Amino acid sequence: RVHIRASRATGKPLIIHTRAAAEDTLRIMREEGAGTDAGGVGGVMHCFTESLEVAQAAIEMGFYISFSGIVTFKSAKELQAVALALPLERMLIETDSPYLAPMPHRGKTNEPSFVCHVAQYLASLKGIPVEQVARQTTDNFFSLFKLQQLWAERADA
């Protein structure tokens, strides 16, 4: 709750990692007004592994859903279905280094450069070019942190 209140006070987005506590997490987010729908600043559901319903509830509150290397695992069929169903405009990609290395590096120490495997997997899953995933998730990052002007200046350079 303090984390949410600090986010509201500073105008900085929340980074939320919930594991086996989705109902409690969403309830607290609602009670504390974490979402943009309640005057909060929104944020990101980091290293997301929950259901489509949880993802949709978070998106309705103005959150992005971030996928790590877990989405590339053969055993992650439910998570892959979530990723397929979500709009790319509300997705982020991450590595969660040094853990959860994506295929083909599973079981090894993860590193930031492996984020390309997450992007490639999501592109293949959605049937779109990897460049589209890279471009949209980069735009989403700059939007989340309210850095669109910086992104525009970089693009113009």
Regions of interest found by a model, annotated:
Residues I65-S68:
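Helix-adjacent hinge/juxtasegments
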Residues M103-H105, A119-Q120:
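Crotonase-superfamily enoyl-CoA hydratase/isomerase domain that binds
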Residues E89-S97:
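Non-cysteine beta-strand/loop elements that form the S-adenosyl-L-methionine
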Residues A38, M91-L92, E131, L150:
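Secondary-structure boundary/capping residues
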Residues S113-A157:
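Mid-to-C-terminal alpha-helical segments outside catalytic/metal-binding sites
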